[in-house]
Amino acid sequence: MVSPTKMIIRSPLKETDTNLKHNNGIAASTTAAGHLNVFSNDNNCNNNNTTESFPKKRSLERLELQQQQHLHEKKRARIERARSIEGAVQVSKGTGLKNVEPRVTPKELLEWQTNWKKIMKRDSRIYFDITDDVEMNTYNKSKMDKRRDLLKRGFLTLGAQITQFFDTTVTIVITRRSVENIYLLKDTDILSRAKKNYMKVWSYEKAARFLKNLDVDLDHLSKTKSASLAAPTLSNLLHNEKLYGPTDRDPRTKRDDIHYFKYPHVYLYDLWQTWAPIITLEWKPQELTNLDELPYPILKIGSFGRCPFIGDRNYDESSYKRVVKRYSRDKANKKYALQLRALFQYHADTLLNTSSVNDQTKNLIFIPHTCNDSTKSFKKWMQEKAKNFEKTELKKTDDSAVQDVRNEHADQTDEKNSILLNETETKEPPLKEEKENKQSIAEESNKYPQRKELAATPKLNHPVLATFARQETEEVPDDLCTLKTKSRQAFEIKASGAHQSNDVATSFGNGLGPTRASVMSKNMKSLSRLMVDRKLGVKQTNGNNKNYTATIATTAETSKENRHRLDFNALKKDEAPSKETGKDSAVHLETNRKPQNFPKVATKSVSADSKVHNDIKITTTESPTASKKSTSTNVTLHFNAQTAQTAQPVKKETVKNSGYCENCRVKYESLEQHIVSEKHLSFAENDLNFEAIDSLIENLRFQI
């Protein structure tokens, strides 16, 4: 009860009741004290004239006045708190002193009832919370269920809609739980969500009081079997017909405008029923017979790096290596995996405090699947290994038993075996003769020079791409980044979209050849300058006096150490033995050469005087006995014996090939003379000048 001092209307010009109350008491005491003081003074002054009865009489009168004041305060009307439907109404001092009037006038009550009845018919959707309190027993639960049905019938008489599901269109939530501590509930709780969405949350007592104020007699409804429903409106009829079909037919029969799913299906729809269903798919059983060609994606087995919805048919999940690897991994992570399952399972909250894994796995839900269980697969392999071991042991015992039987019967069959051995010795050649024949063949073969056999081609470290053979990936690390990638192409790649209009752009035939950059980079350009192509030209002169010039070109292996050159002086030395045969002599020069791809050696020109009759014939023949890789070139030079002695050696005409040396940064007239000069040799012998190209070669060799 609120104290009277807080409810009284105060004025700054008037005393309040509280002040009066305290002041009156103080005044009474002061007056009494004053009278006593007066009495004492009078007594002191008129000690002889007064009597004892006078002060007693006046003190009794004052005591009576005090008692009357106390009785007046008790009879004062207390300030009361009046309640109405809108809320608490504070009654002032003036109204409190008067007789208590009705809280709400009949006119206000009628307006309130008509407004709420309109609201109930128009847009009220009521949801009854089915969650019970933990402490509620079975008797109270059945009692609350009956009361819930009674409240539903009461709201139906007002024309309100009762929804079976909670959604955002609900306006009132009626629950049997306590409404005081809603903020302590979880965010997913219905009461908490209703409070956040500004819905009304009522208890059963408040709902019953609300219906009573709307003149709904719940006692009468509890006695009658069926509730008197409100008059149906057109909107309600259309809504019910849309949901349940027309009223002139059986609602339990199938409807033509509704598709009923019979087989496995996917139905994705809007929970608020605002939008039409997004996905509706259904598959018949005949469409699901082939597991490899299912109409919907499923997880398939495959190696790492593969899409799990595509899988790999060549992937053997039941192989021994994979089973052992998977079993060891699952065994090591079993405890942690079960703890994760217990954490993420909604009804396993009570199992988190348990220490043993067996207690946690009791109430866990495992989804059935068709994948291979590592434990079962490992046990199968162990059983097969045990069977194979038993078979090998039995085979060994059988072999030993057979050997024992043979040894037992060996003595009995000695004569027969000796006869059979004699017959075989007569038919087959002796072993000694075979050994002698093999030794003789080996000695004869050692006499002839044997050709060295070529080394076997090394096996490739990587599989051949043409076969696309699957390799075992168990021993390969899972980190694919550790593998070496293929080396880059030796030339620069042409930029995307670049195409020249000159002849270079169309010089690749059908256009399928590799494209190269038309503009060389600075690094490649500087490296190409260090290379010099030694292309020596050949001058051919025709004289008036029948001068013949012959060009002899032979290919040989060129290196820094030795170069084979065909010189005219070498031919002149072989001229002496040919004089004895006659006037005309022939010098035969045979050279065996291998057709290797090396640059041609500088050709030599041989010129003879007009007085000397020389015939030079060059014939190249291939001997049938020679190998395919070698050819014999017969150079026959016919000289006149009389003029051979007087013939002078012809001077070589030096071919001047001028240019610019990028290394020495010097112009030269002859390349042959420049490469022998001291300046060029000092540059060529310094290894620091070739450090860049050496590193490039090492990198290319490493990638190959």
UniProtKB/Swiss-Prot annotation:
Span of zinc fingers (DBF4-type): 654-703
Region Disordered: start-end pairs: 397-453
GO biological process: cell division; chromosome segregation; DNA replication initiation; mitotic DNA replication checkpoint signaling; negative regulation of exit from mitosis; positive regulation of DNA replication initiation; positive regulation of kinetochore assembly; positive regulation of meiosis I
Impact after mutating residue 664 to A: In DBF4-AAHH; weakens interaction with ARS1 origin DNA and MCM2, but not other known ligands
Basic and acidic residues: compositionally biased ranges: 397-417, 424-438, 444-453
GO terms of molecular function: DNA replication origin binding; protein serine/threonine kinase activator activity; zinc ion binding
Matching InterPro entries: BRCT_dom_sf (IPR036420), DBF4_BRCT (IPR055116), Regulatory_Dfp1/Him1 (IPR013939), Replication_Regulatory_Kinase (IPR051590), Znf_DBF (IPR006572), Znf_DBF_sf (IPR038545)
Outcome (variant: residue 680 to A): Weakens interaction with ARS1 origin DNA and MCM2, but not other known ligands. In DBF4-CCAA; weakens interaction with ARS1 origin DNA and MCM2, but not other known ligands
Binding site for Zn(2+): 661, 664, 674, 680
GO terms for cellular component: centrosome; chromatin; chromosome, centromeric region; cytoplasm; Dbf4-dependent protein kinase complex; nucleus
Keyword vocabulary terms for this entry: Cell cycle, Cell division, Chromosome partition, DNA replication, DNA-binding, Meiosis, Metal-binding, Mitosis, Phosphoprotein, Zinc, Zinc-finger
SMART domains attached to this UniProt entry: ZnF_DBF
Positions of modified residues (Phosphoserine): 59, 84, 235, 623
Domain of life according to the entry: Eukaryota
Annotated region (D box 1), positions in chain: 10-19
Residue segments, region D box 2: 62-70
Motif annotated as POLO box domain (PBD)-binding, chain positions: 83-88
A Pfam family per the record: Dfp1_Him1_M
Induction: Cell cycle-regulated. Protein levels increase as cells begin S phase and remain high through late mitosis.
Reported modifications of this chain: Phosphorylated by CDC7 and by CDC5.
Role summary: Regulatory subunit of the CDC7-DBF4 kinase, also called DBF4-dependent kinase (DDK), which is involved in cell cycle regulation of premitotic and premeiotic chromosome replication and in chromosome segregation. DDK plays an essential role in initiating DNA replication at replication origins by phosphorylating the MCM2 and MCM4 subunits of the MCM2-7 helicase complex. DBF4 recruits the catalytic subunit CDC7 to MCM2 and to origins of replication. DDK also has postreplicative functions in meiosis.
Subunit structure: Heterodimer with CDC7 to form the DBF4-dependent kinase (DDK) complex. Interacts (via PBD-binding motif) with CDC5 (via POLO box domains). Interacts (via N-terminus) with ORC2, ORC3 and RAD53. Binds to ARS1 origin DNA.
Protein name as catalogued: DDK kinase regulatory subunit DBF4
Species assigned in the record: Saccharomyces cerevisiae (strain ATCC 204508 / S288c) (Baker's yeast)
Gene, per the UniProt record: DBF4
